Regions:
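Low-complexity, Ser/Thr/Pro/Gly-enriched N-terminal "stalk/linker" regions
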Residues: 1-43, 70, 74, 78-89
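Core register positions within helices of long alpha-helical scaffolds
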Residues: 51, 117, 177-180, 184, ...
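Aromatic-rich carbohydrate-recognition surfaces in CAZymes
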Residues: 37-151, 171
Length: 292
């Protein structure tokens, strides 16, 4: 099976999830109803759109541009919904209505991931589609940065939607979003965030215990989880931002990876296979070998 065939299948599956809802711009996490993943998560949608943006960069195909525009219009719509936790609301129904059932909210990685993505979109569209950028991209970014800065010191739920407190993953993507805002501040953005960013980087060091990265603290400051797949995802999703690597060298991520591999080899008798899940003793659907 060649790589081009695999890539085509992956893209096809992405497009199925993008085109599932009648409301353009909605991206389902999965067509599954059990577990119930047929929702538009702010986090998941932003990560899916990273792939679409990359495809547009490579191909300049109109369909990918249309996916991007649909996504932008939908996110602008979602930002204005009357939801329980505002921009920290983790997901919405695929018909565009708020999801108001009990859930782990707020989840403050979502707006940051969306913001990181939108700066990528900003950079690739600003010359060819300046009106689109000014009318859609910039206002979404501004609302997200205002929310993130206002809530930096407040606890939230982690990306696994289980722990309420402070989380390595959430804080890293927030830091990356703020850094991107600062990098673009000489153009259209003017909020002064340099000192906020520098202080936030200092606070990130709370997640270091020697060479070990602490994934989550509860609201009392107690360590809740250490070896967690979200630590590895954090490095990927901030695109190995150098300011972050200066604090958390990749050798520290390697320690987390090695511990996870060891734990899952023991759990599933994997011998030499390097397959991991979210974290050791994960009980959700028996804690299988997966993470976002």
């Amino acid at each position: 099976m060649n790589n081009s065939f695999i890539n085509e299948k992956i893209i096809s599956k992405l497009e199925e999830n993008i085109n599932f809802s009648k409301k353009k711009g909605m991206i389902i996490a999965s067509p599954s109803s059990s577990p119930p993943y047929k929702f538009h998560w702010i986090r998941d949608a932003a990560l899916v759109m990273r792939a679409i943006v990359d495809l547009y960069k490579k191909t300049k195909e109109d369909k990918y541009l249309m996916y991007i525009i649909n996504y932008l219009e939908n996110e602008a719509y979602i930002q204005n919904l009357d939801t329980i936790s505002g921009l920290g609301e983790p997901k919405v129904n695929i018909d565009g209505t708020p999801f108001n059932d009990s859930w782990g909210r707020p989840q403050n990685d979502g707006p940051a991931l969306r913001g990181i993505l939108l700066f990528d979109i900003y950079d690739i569209l600003k010359n060819d589609y300046p009106n689109l950028v000014d009318s859609l991209v910039v206002p979404i970014i501004q609302k997200d940065i205002d929310y993130i800065v206002a809530n930096l010191k407040k606890p939230s739920f982690d990306l696994w939607e289980e722990i309420y407190g402070w989380h390595f993953y959430t804080r890293l993507v927030q830091a990356k979003f703020i850094k991107e805002y600062i990098n673009h501040s000489s153009s259209i953005f003017n909020k002064k965030l340099d000192n906020i960013y520098k202080n936030f980087l200092v606070n990130l060091k709370d997640h270091l215990n020697g060479n070990t990265i602490i994934s989550s603290f509860d609201t009392d400051g107690n360590i809740v989880r250490i070896d967690d797949g979200s630590v590895l995802l954090a490095f990927c999703h901030v695109k190995y931002e150098q300011d972050i690597l200066d604090i958390f060298p990749l050798e520290f991520a390697k320690i987390t990876a090695e511990n996870l591999i060891s734990d899952f080899r023991k759990k599933y008798n994997l011998h030499n296979l390097n397959l991991i899940g979210r974290y050791n003793n994960d009980a959700y659907f028996d804690g299988q070998l997966w993470f976002i």
